[in-house]
């Protein structure tokens, strides 16, 4: 294991569940994220909430040297990436312990190491 590394914690949520839950649930979740950020400020190196998947634009190569630009997410799935945190941790185990604290009541998180220190 490396001495200290950076990890991307990607937050995936089901937008339909959030829509059904309404603004009070969203506001409560924002508060939980603020609390998470305050409790883990020593490890956080960045993070942000992303716009809804309906605002996404995907770019794919067309196989002829050009590109195809389409509205929508790259992959069509029920859960979409709604935000992320960049964290610094001693190792993957520590990163996972931090990631377990990320509020994600309508989905979950995925943790990946940043290659070559970012």
Give residue spans per PLM region.
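Conserved, structured core segments of small domains
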Residues: 1-118
